[in-house]
Amino acid sequence: MTIKLIVGLGNPGKNYKYHRHNVGFWFCDALAKLYAGNFKKRTKFFGEVTQINIFNHKIQLLKPTTFMNCSGQSIQSIANFYQINADEILIVHDELNINPGIAKIKSGGSHGGHNGLKNTIKILETKAFYRLRIGIGHPGNKLPIVDFVLNTPSKDELDKIQNALNNSLQVIEDVIKNNLDKVIKTLQKKEII
């Protein structure tokens, strides 16, 4: 397996830019900057796309512009066009059940209530893609989930989320090389609670 497509989940537009639900977009923006990518709107892919090279591997970066709950349409269109299999896709998304400051990677699994993943699984008809889960924490009983994810994190939470994103960027080359055991261990060592 070699990752050929990295998708950051989020909602398009200025109103959503700094919301917790957009950490996937934040990751893709930072990765594009790191590898000299320049996002362009591609209507046939229902998103913004750029191509980067990591270790001579061409990798498509995608930020769907379909809004979170319809992300699968965008992912399917680019995967079909470039003939990318599900196990060659890494989806980066916010994760309620992980504390801010923590990032985890895994293959497969359920959508865990995440509507972007739920739609992607439905459209692709598989769970066999990789996920980079960026912890945003859970509001508990303080706030409805939708209000929590569609809101900006506190300064402390933002610092921790940014740290998890930076740690994830540092291991992306190992992700591309398929050194997932190393990635898992490295991310565990860098957890900030």
Swiss-Prot record:
HAMAP family in the cross-refs: Pept_tRNA_hydro_bact
Annotated Pfam families: Pept_tRNA_hydro
Subunit structure: Monomer.
Role of this protein: Hydrolyzes ribosome-free peptidyl-tRNAs (with 1 or more amino acids incorporated), which drop off the ribosome during protein synthesis, or as a result of ribosome stalling. Catalyzes the release of premature peptidyl moieties from peptidyl-tRNA molecules trapped in stalled 50S ribosomal subunits, and thus maintains levels of free tRNAs and 50S ribosomes.
Organism: Vesicomyosocius okutanii subsp. Calyptogena okutanii (strain HA)
Primary location class: cytoplasm
Enzyme class name: hydrolase
Family recorded in the similarity comment: Belongs to the PTH family.
Listed EC numbers: 3.1.1.29
Sorted UniProt keywords: Cytoplasm, Hydrolase, RNA-binding, tRNA-binding
UniProt-annotated site: Stabilizes the basic form of H active site to accept a proton, residues: D94
Protein name, as recorded: Peptidyl-tRNA hydrolase
Superkingdom, taxonomy of origin: Bacteria
Gene Ontology MF annotations: peptidyl-tRNA hydrolase activity; tRNA binding
